[in-house]
Amino acid sequence: MKKGLLILLTFHFSLLVSLAQQGDAQIRQKISQAAAAMKTMQCDFVQTKHLKMLSEEMVSKGRMCYQQSQCLRWEYTSPYDYTLIINHDKVLLKNRQRQDVIDVNQNRFFKEIASIMMNSVVGNCLNDDKSFKSTVTARGGEWVATLTPQRRDMKQMFREIILHFSQREAMVTQVELIEKNGDRTTIELKNVKTNETISPDMFTVR
């Protein structure tokens, strides 16, 4: 009797695991298909920084533009003006006082940051098995992907990266960056437009 019950429970558990793995694979496939179909993306964003040492949150706002083939413009407009542009292997950092151009191939830190930003906005981090261990779950009307860094340099920066996807569009709606010390940055994407023409000037690095 006990042996039969154990066999039944084992079978039931195996079935649940199998169904979960199938669901996970289907979600990943839908996200990958949506990312591949997204040639451009434009949106507003609200970034909220939660610091363990402070009770007040730091909120900033801005505009993001993405173009498939490694181009990203991340522009803060409030409470300060600051722009980061990624164009393949070049990064431009610009504010009102100065601007700097960085070759990411010669700066490992910026290469990692550029990779995380570029891949997070469309969900491609899910396909980077060498950099992240990831799990995907359905929660309400969204999919939530939790990414745990695997490489040593990534572990020094982040404990987890959590991506929230709309189930309807299979697109990222929110990114959470949990740092090693427990500080958390939440980025919410709003007014998203996809596959509309973006001027090449938006990604100029010089």
Which residue stretches match the model-derived regions?
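Short hydrophobic/aromatic-rich beta-strand segments that constitute the beta-sheet cores
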Residues: 45, 72-76, 91-94, 145-147, ...
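Gly/Pro-enriched, hydrophobic low-complexity segments
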Residues: 102, 125-206
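Positively charged n-region of N-terminal signal peptides that target proteins for export
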Residues: 1-4
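Flexible, processing/modification-adjacent segments and terminal tails
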Residues: 26-27, 32-44, 49, 55-57, ...
